[in-house]
Amino acid sequence: SHEFGHYIVAKYFGYDTQIHYASTSWRYPDPNNPIVTGYPIAITLGGPIQTMFTGTIGIVILFLSRNSFFQADKLSFRQWFIIFISLFWLRQTANLCTWLGSYFVNGKLSSRGDEIHIANYYHLPNWTVVTTTAIIATLLLAIIIFKFIPLRQRGTFLSAGLTGGIAGYIFWLVLFGKYIMP
């Protein structure tokens, strides 16, 4: 859905667009028509805004139906689905972790990623957008985990989420994504 956020904005501005396994590419169909400089930043913003918007919808639904969560000893499929939608915010925390992780592995901070490009566009230090959104995400995730997930399911949720998140990253971004959606 993140890449679809880029795709929708690029299509809106008339670009030829393709979604790949880890990115969205766009080009203007008429090479003689200059690209307005504001469009690339709007397209870049489309992905993170879409992802955070989806997560925010989930959080709003969580709070609107909080009584059913507070009374539950074990969450229903519907409740887990709402939590899943809320966890779209997890991308922001994961981005900061992978950004810092690449520093510890490579000895330098990556200049790639939507949040870094957004910071550069607005002449902010590289860390500002990725760190600010990760802090917001971490606070929201703490509320989700400690307020809405019953204690008896919390440990399983955290261990399964961590294992699934790492496995999903490896399977999709490293191993199979490039073959399924080149």
Report residues per predicted region:
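Metalloprotease/metallohydrolase-associated module, dominated by Zn2+-dependent proteases
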Residues: P29-I149, Y169
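Juxtamembrane boundary at the C-terminal end of a transmembrane helix
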Residues: I170-P182
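Interfacial loop-to-transmembrane junctions
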Residues: F148-I166
